[in-house]
């Protein structure tokens, strides 16, 4: 056991960042080195490395900076400058949480644009695959229909700190994360197109 590395990981985890750990007693989802997470409807385990014979992965990633989104959302408020002191929100989180539904709608509007970009890009990839322009696809190693279009998420710790939250195991922080990740999860399912020939499947990637 590398005790020095263990202590480093424990220290960083205690601060709420830098390292990501995903564990599951019931493997009903995908997890890869790039932290792709997506529920599996058939309750089976698959590896994104392809070593199990299951071909999965991402054909494209668009990353959203949650910190930027939260601050841009607050900039839509009337006299928003009055609510910022020393670069952070100057009002209790309970007040902000009352506008969660508005922030959710703001995030959904951004996600709707992201899905359009993803669909347009993957449509181009499908056309290139049909034209036999990908040697790996021609050889049967990869199929575009098996690949996900991924939405990366960064800056959620910084967004929480901007709102005056402690990045730790506490109710307020977890409520904020549930809002962000829950909204993305719902919209991924809602906007996925399960076409037999040209499916468009979305998942999310949490980047520490």
Tell where the protein language model's regions lie, with residue ranges:
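Core structural elements
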Residues: 138-159
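Well-ordered alpha-helical scaffold segments within catalytic/enzyme domains
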Residues: 158-166
């Amino acid at each position: 056991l590398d005790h020095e590395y263990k202590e480093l990981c424990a220290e960083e985890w205690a601060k709420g960042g830098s390292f990501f750990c995903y564990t599951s007693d019931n493997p009903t989802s995908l997890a890869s080195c790039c932290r792709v997470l997506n529920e599996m409807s058939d309750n089976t385990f698959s590896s994104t490395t392809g070593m199990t014979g299951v071909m999965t992965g991402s054909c494209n990633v668009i990353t959203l900076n949650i910190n930027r989104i939260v601050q841009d959302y607050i900039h839509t408020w009337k006299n928003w400058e009055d609510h910022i002191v020393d670069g952070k929100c100057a009002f209790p989180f309970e007040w902000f949480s009352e506008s969660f539904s508005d922030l959710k709608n703001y995030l959904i509007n951004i996600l709707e644009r992201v899905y359009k970009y993803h669909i347009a890009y993957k449509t181009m990839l499908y056309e290139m695959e049909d034209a036999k322009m990908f040697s790996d696809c021609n050889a049967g190693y990869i199929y575009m229909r098996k690949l996900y279009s991924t939405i990366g998420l960064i800056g959620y710790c910084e967004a929480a700190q901007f709102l005056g939250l402690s990045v730790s195991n506490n109710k307020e922080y977890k409520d904020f994360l549930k809002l962000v990740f829950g909204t993305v999860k719902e919209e991924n399912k809602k906007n996925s197109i399960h076409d037999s020939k040209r499916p468009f499947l979305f998942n999310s990637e949490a980047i520490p």
